[in-house]
Amino acid sequence: MPDFAEPLARLITEFKRLPGIGQKSAQRLAFHVLRAKREDAEHLSQAILDVKDKLGLCAVCNNIADGEICQYCSDSNRDPSVVCVVEEPHNIVGIETTRQFEGRYHVLHGALSPLRGVGPDMLKIKGLVERIGQGEVREVIVATNPNVEGEATAVYLARLLKPLGVKVTRIGMGIPVGSDLEFADEVTISKAMEGRREM
């Protein structure tokens, strides 16, 4: 690796810590910032700080929110009786691009993974059970990723939630096993939502 001036080397190192960014991409990004106007670099750094300082988790569903409640939980046009459970906030983006789901969400912030030491207590499941206990939820659509952890999470949720009197469905296949909802196109996600099956 070539020797870079310390500030540039540090920026490259920080960019490499981002998912999907290797050495060459990190270098390209760092040189872009170096060539950019100071004002543009300040806007970028302020946007990063704002994300950390001004965003939190929705008190209802654990999605990203810039207030106490996210835009989906506060939207009175959405159906509160249908809740789609996803692993991460970015999974909501893929579902929303279909423009077909009109219910609400619940974000687990992960999936069960005994090999990595992630058990049910480490996920945001308690709030989902509490929402169901309030009596408004009729159906829970489990839209965890189609991999081992996602399937294990789906089975666990079905066993936990069915005795509470709600219909538990799993999104249909069409999303390749081992993939992530984030990378699926809107038609595939739309078909998976239409083809959901009861668990």
Swiss-Prot record:
Domain of life of the source: Bacteria
InterPro entries: DNA_Rcmb_RecR, Rcmb_RecR, Rcmb_RecR_Znf, TOPRIM_dom, TOPRIM_RecR
GO biological process terms, semicolon-separated: DNA recombination; DNA repair
Keywords: DNA damage, DNA recombination, DNA repair, Metal-binding, Zinc, Zinc-finger
SS bond partners: none
GO MF term set: DNA binding; zinc ion binding
Keyword DNA repair found: yes
PROSITE patterns to which the protein is assigned, alphabetical: TOPRIM (PS50880)
Coiled coil residues, start to end: none
Record family assignment: Belongs to the RecR family.
Protein name as catalogued: Recombination protein RecR
Organism lineage: Bacteria, Pseudomonadati, Acidobacteriota, Terriglobia, Bryobacterales
Gene: recR
